[in-house]
From Swiss-Prot:
Family assignment from sequence similarity: Belongs to the actin family. ARP8 subfamily.
GO cellular component, one term: Ino80 complex
Source species of the chain: Oryza sativa subsp. japonica (Rice)
One of the Pfam families matching this protein, by short name: Actin
SUPFAM superfamilies hit by this protein: Actin-like ATPase domain
Any one GO BP annotation for this protein: double-strand break repair
Spans annotated as Disordered: 141-169
InterPro entries to which the protein is assigned, alphabetical: Actin (IPR004000), ATPase_NBD (IPR043129)
Protein name: Actin-related protein 9
Leader sequence residues: none
Length: 586
């Protein structure tokens, strides 16, 4: 303890971080890296497998995600247009029907095609190239032997009787990351996202076994290809799982089993994403607002402990804002005549995300921009068109008025998924901690939580401002509420949206009931890129955890399963906060 009070943070990171791997999985991306790194690898959380087509079938890319409603219903469209007009009045921009072209106007002038672009315009970030799905390394029938003696069992080839230089094996069997999102639509691949809307993406067409296999394969590929950790050496490393509050107990168990039993880490620990985000910014008390790609979570943290009754989940995020951007342009008749389909063509979602990150912001008044939009209808002809994007300040306002977003609905896991009878957490969460005083840690952060349906409150149509106010007021103590209203912390990729923080400050303060003696609301500026704050917090918690009471060993997990923790707060939470502040101030 005395050593930690005097050690230089950079030295501590070098000593303790080299053999720690921090994993922060999300619905759209997974962030993985060594604790000694400044920033993690941020890789799309997906996998594409080559599928064999029947002779009569037309080769095509299939997306395994099964949405309940891929298109908005007429009532949803009506609500969306009303929400747009509300936003338009607040931002002082024209309503939808005030900015439409006349009937005799074939194409607005802003949609003129551009045949020649300047060198600067050619550098547009929204342009992507198709993934080459052919395995160029296969040139003969001689088997390719890996330079390492140990072969990773997760990446062994399956059929021994197939010629390596056959036409079928010329295709890459598995494609990961962004390359998987850029596979041409005419290629025979099945694209899968194992996590959607903060849960395992289980459906009738995507079984639990397949979800776990894909998670294992994706993480193994990142560890091998990006972090260069040989499978035979993984027993020398420990893993820190930074998990969002949306995951239920069984999903947490399965991911822990993947890390310890399948990937081969010697020990592992789990930290809540909200708690890690607070420590990632050097705080021990904060209202953490995590705006992810598909889920927004609001959780209050007090003295290094996430308060379970304050946790809220909102089923929308950055991806919904990107799709709303497309809808707004089409309603304004500014989008080119391209078959842009972010649901069925992942490369279109990549383009929309780039446009959103480049142009969307919250500000008053008309806000337009000229950009080059690309068409990815066919891999042999990638067209482009220069267009004027209109009302770019409307889509991010969907965080405050979610009816303008109309998010896709992913089917929840079947009810039998929650019947995990060997999970003691679901049976003992109301039991006194004194009964388990001899517990050796493990799930200490979760063992006071009920099972998922009552642990996390979900709201479909409330805005982010109402969620923040509701979460903070649910704490019930005025002094704590004042601290939390002055310590609102935005994390996640969408948290970087220009103009979001001041709008939230003003609207949160105006939404607080008049009978509450609260005079101030403040959104704190993030100390680093908001997307990586929870990951960095996991690094700090892992490096500074000297006792490792909650760490689980691979042998213990395989033999005994769930360990009941002590349910206590961090005994040294204030000390951890001081160390975190020291780390950032050095």
């Amino acid at each position: 303890m005395d050593y930690l009070k005097t050690v230089v943070p950079s030295q501590l990171m070098a000593e303790r971080g080299a053999n720690l791997v921090v994993i922060n999985p999300g619905s759209s991306n997974v962030r993985i890296g060594f604790a000694s790194q400044d920033v993690p690898f941020n890789i799309p959380h997906c996998i594409a497998r080559h599928i064999t087509q029947q002779k009569d079938d037309t080769p095509r890319l299939s997306v395994r995600d099964k949405m309940l409603n891929c298109h908005a219903t007429p009532s949803q469209n009506a609500e969306r247009e009303r929400a747009y007009d509300i936003i338009a009045s607040l931002l002082k921009i024209p309503f939808l029907d005030e900015d439409m072209p006349s009937a005799n106007q074939a194409l607005p002038p802003k949609m003129g095609r551009v045949d020649a672009l300047s060198s600067q315009q050619n550098k547009d970030d929204s342009k992507f190239t198709w993934t080459d799905v052919m395995d160029r390394s296969i040139k003969s029938s001689t088997p390719i032997v890996d330079k390492d003696a140990d072969v990773d069992p997760l990446q062994r080839s399956t059929p021994d009787d197939t010629e390596p230089n056959s036409e079928e094996n010329m295709y890459k069997e598995i494609i990961f990351g962004e390359d998987a999102l850029k596979i041409p639509p005419s290629e025979s691949y099945c694209l899968s996202h194992p996590i959607r809307r903060g849960h395992f993406n289980i459906s009738q067409d995507y079984s639990l076994h397949q979800v776990l296999e894909d998670l294992r394969t994706i993480w193994n590929w990142i560890l091998t290809e990006k972090l260069h950790i040989n499978p035979r050496d993984r027993h020398l490393y420990s893993a820190i799982l930074v998990l969002g509050e949306t995951f239920d107990n069984r999903e947490i168990k399965e991911m822990l089993s993947i890390v310890l039993c399948d990937l081969g880490f010697s020990t592992a620990v789990i930290h809540q994403e909200a708690l890690a985000a607070a420590f990632g910014n050097g705080l021990s008390t904060s209202c953490v607002v995590n705006i992810g790609a598909q889920v927004t979570q609001v959780v209050c943290v007090e003295d290094g402990v996430a308060l379970p009754h304050t946790a809220l989940a909102l089923p929308y995020g950055g991806d919904d804002i990107s799709r709303c951007l497309l809808w707004v342009q089409r309603r304004h008749c500014t989008w080119p005549n391209f078959q842009t389909d972010p649901v069925n063509k992942p490369i279109d979602m990549l383009m929309l995300n780039k446009l959103k990150e480049s142009y969307s912001q919250i500000r008053s008044g008309s806000f337009d921009a000229v950009s080059v939009v690309h068409s990815y209808e066919h891999e042999k002809s990638v067209g482009h068109q220069k267009t004027k994007l209109s009302a770019l300040n409307v889509p991010p306002m969907g965080l405050l008025y979610p009816r303008v977003l109309v998010p896709e609905e992913y089917p929840p896991p079947p009810r039998s998924w929650f019947q995990d009878y060997d999970d003691m957490l679901e049976d003992t969460w109301q039991t006194s901690d004194s009964l388990y005083s001899s517990g050796n840690g493990g799930f200490g952060m979760w063992d006071n939580y009920p099972m998922f349906p009552t642990r996390l409150k979900k709201f479909d149509n409330i805005g982010l401002v109402e969620a923040i106010v509701s979460s903070i007021l649910s704490t019930g103590r005025i002094e704590l509420q004042r601290k939390l209203f002055c310590s609102i912390q935005l994390v996640g990729g969408t948290a970087s949206t220009a103009g979001l923080a001041p709008v939230l400050e003003q609207r949160v303060l105006n939404t607080i009931p008049s009978n509450q003696p609260i005079e101030k609301a403040e959104v704190l500026q993030s100390r680093s890129y908001p997307l990586f704050v929870p990951w960095k917090g996991g690094v700090i918690l892992g490096v500074l955890d000297i006792g490792r009471d909650a760490w689980i060993h691979r042998e213990d997990w395989a033999k005994n399963g769930v360990h009941i923790g002590s349910g206590r707060k961090y005994r040294d939470s204030y000390f951890l906060q001081a160390q975190a502040m020291c780390y950032y101030n050095s």
